[in-house]
């Protein structure tokens, strides 16, 4: 994902790629923070937390797409610090269609009796259920006032990222599905987050919808 993000940033007229932080390249994040206004992180959850804290202390905004990232420790650290030095946006999914799917599912959950979520990903994905599915279930529960719907996870070679929300009521069902065919589908959302993270009124926030709607 990092290579795809770098390519997208380089192609954007209003952005400049100033560094690629990667231990395999011998480049540590702390060594390049002075050059950056925004850092995009697609690492592992434990690494992403340390990276985000380092960025915030340096006054650098952060966009996090790391799968399975828990924002609670970051929020606690920010609250303890007491200063709003930089903003953090965490997105379970950067695909615009996926964000719309979650929004539609939350709206439908207000009107349909029951629902279940099926999420399918490549067999190299580390977390199950996916962050997108967990976020969808949470939004649906908040909208309906009920409990989060069950989530079924599938991990198989040949898949990229897919999710279907199936809602049922008396004599009818409703299916809302999103399919990611290529990782390039995430890039418009990543670039949007990079452009908007600095103007967030609260931080950290979870969900691309915070800058999309």
Residue ranges and their predicted role:
Residues 36:
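An anion/phosphate-binding loop that grips the pyrophosphate of nucleotide cofactors and donors
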């Amino acid at each position: 994902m990092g290579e795809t993000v770098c390519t997208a940033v380089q192609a954007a007229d209003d952005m400049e790629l100033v560094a690629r932080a990667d231990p395999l390249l011998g480049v540590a994040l702390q060594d390049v923070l002075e050059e950056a206004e925004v850092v995009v992180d697609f690492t592992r959850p434990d690494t992403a937390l340390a990276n985000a804290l380092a960025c915030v202390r340096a006054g650098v905004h952060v966009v996090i797409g790391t799968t399975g990232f828990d924002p609670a420790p970051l929020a606690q650290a920010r609250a303890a610090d007491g200063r709003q030095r930089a903003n953090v946006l965490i997105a379970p999914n950067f695909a615009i269609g996926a964000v719309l799917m979650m929004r539609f599912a939350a709206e439908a959950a207000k009107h349909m009796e029951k629902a279940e979520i099926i999420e399918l990903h490549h067999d190299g994905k580390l977390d199950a259920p996916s962050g997108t599915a967990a976020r969808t279930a949470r939004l649906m529960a908040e909208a309906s006032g009920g409990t989060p719907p069950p989530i079924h996870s599938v991990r198989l070679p040949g898949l990229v990222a897919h999710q279907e929300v199936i809602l049922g009521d008396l004599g009818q069902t409703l299916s809302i599905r999103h399919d990611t065919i290529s990782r390039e589908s995430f890039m418009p959302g990543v670039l949007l987050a990079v452009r908007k993270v600095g103007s967030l009124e609260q931080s950290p926030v979870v969900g691309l919808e915070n800058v999309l709607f």
